[in-house]
Amino acid sequence: MQTEQLPRLEAGEYPGGIWYYEPHTYLPYRYVLGRVGRHPLVCIGINPSTAQPGALDPTLKSVERLANANGFDSWIMFNVYPQRATDPNDMDRVPDRALCDENLRWLRAVLAETEPTMWAAWGTLIEKRDYLPGLMREMVALTREREIPWVTFGRRSKKGHPHHPLYLRKDST
C-alpha cells in the first residue's frame, strides 16, 4: 500500500507578518490561511472570500479574535469548499473534485503538523449546495481518525447548524 505524500505546511513572510497561505498567491480558490503556531484553532467555514495575509475580512477578524480570547497560540481558516466567492450563491453548482481532493490533502497536512482544536463554523450556508454536507463529513472523518476535539461558539441555528463567525456577537468567547 502506497502512502500519500502530503504537502508541506510552510510559513511565509507576507504583509502583517508570518502566515500560512496556500496557495501562496491570490487565486480563485484557497486552502489554508492562518497564523503560525503549534496549537491552532482551526475554523471550518463554507468557502473563502477575498481575505489574504494582512488583509483579513470581517469573518477572519472574528476568527482571530475568538482564537486569541480562548488561549490558542494561532488560528487557521479552512473551508468545506475552497472556491473563493464573496457571495455563496456564486459557488460552483457541481463541485470540482480535484479542488475537493486537494483541500483534503491540505487538511491532512495541517492535522499532521499541528495539535489543533477544530471549530465547526459553517452556519446555515451548508445548505447552499447539495454537495456541501458530504464534503463536510469527509473533513470531520479525517479529524475523527486522530481524535481531534471540536468546538462551536454561540448558539446553534434553528436547523441545528453551528454559528458562522461573522454572525457571532462581538463579546462571544
Regions from the PLM with identified roles:
Residues 40, 73-74, 149:
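Residues at the starts of beta-strands that form the adenosine-phosphate
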Residues 47-50, 83, 125:
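A short, flexible beta-alpha/helix-coil linker loop
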Residues 27, 56-64, 97-106:
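Short acidic (Asp/Glu) patches
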Residues 49-71:
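A short mixed-secondary-structure module that forms the rim of ligand-binding clefts
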Residues 91-173:
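Glycine/proline-rich loop-helix segments at beta-alpha junctions forming the active-site rim
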Residues 73-90:
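Short connector loops at secondary-structure junctions
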Residues 1-57:
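Active-site and ligand/interface coordination hotspots across diverse enzymes
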